């Protein structure tokens, strides 16, 4: 498949996917971005959202709670704090993500509170957009 980059997504529990992708849409902390073959080397943090990888069997989508993505001209490696394939995503899973984010926001130090509240708001938006 011409014009591809190697896509890998892992969480602490397991490897979720590894395949050649034509593009990967990433929910970056500083804004969404699309990685394609030839991308400039970049490391970005992830915010809660949906990551979409366009591969040989169509679009594979994953809900991520945060993490990092390392992108270069030939590959993208995503190290997700938590990740679930969208087809496995349920209201219960989202509620667990939200409860954890809410707890972290409630105990965050003053200098970390803005980021914790932003993460909670991103989780709530993820649930609202998912239809669960």
Curated annotation (Swiss-Prot):
UniProt GO molecular function: ATP binding; proton-transporting ATP synthase activity, rotational mechanism
Membrane topology: Peripheral membrane protein
UniProt keyword Lyase, yes or no: no
Signal peptide interval: none
Keyword Ion transport: yes
Origin superkingdom: Bacteria
Pfam families: ATP-synt_DE_N (PF02823)
GO CC term, one of those recorded: proton-transporting ATP synthase complex
Cellular localization per UniProt: Cell inner membrane
Keywords noted in UniProt: ATP synthesis, Cell inner membrane, Cell membrane, CF(1), Hydrogen ion transport, Ion transport, Membrane, Transport
Disulfide bonds, paired cysteine numbers: none
Assembly behavior: F-type ATPases have 2 components, CF(1) - the catalytic core - and CF(0) - the membrane proton channel. CF(1) has five subunits: alpha(3), beta(3), gamma(1), delta(1), epsilon(1). CF(0) has three main subunits: a, b and c.
PANTHER family hit by this protein: ATP SYNTHASE DELTA/EPSILON CHAIN, ATP SYNTHASE EPSILON CHAIN, CHLOROPLASTIC
Function: Produces ATP from ADP in the presence of a proton gradient across the membrane.
Family according to the record: Belongs to the ATPase epsilon chain family.
Designated name of the protein: ATP synthase epsilon chain 1
Species of provenance: Cereibacter sphaeroides (strain ATCC 17023 / DSM 158 / JCM 6121 / CCUG 31486 / LMG 2827 / NBRC 12203 / NCIMB 8253 / ATH 2.4.1.) (Rhodobacter sphaeroides)
């Amino acid at each position: 498949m011409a014009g591809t980059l190697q896509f890998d997504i892992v969480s602490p529990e397991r490897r979720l996917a590894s395949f050649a992708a034509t593009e990967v849409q990433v929910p970056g902390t500083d804004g969404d971005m699309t990685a394609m073959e030839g991308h400039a080397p970049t490391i970005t943090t992830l915010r809660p959202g949906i990551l979409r990888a366009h591969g040989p069997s169509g679009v594979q989508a994953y809900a991520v709670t945060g993490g990092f993505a390392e992108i270069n001209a030939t590959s993208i490696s995503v190290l997700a704090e938590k990740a679930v394939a969208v087809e496995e995503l349920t209201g219960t899973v989202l509620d667990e993500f939200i409860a954890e984010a809410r707890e972290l926001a409630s105990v965050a130090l003053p200098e970390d509170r803005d980021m914790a509240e932003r993460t909670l708001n991103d989780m709530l938006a993820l649930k609202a957009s998912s239809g669960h």
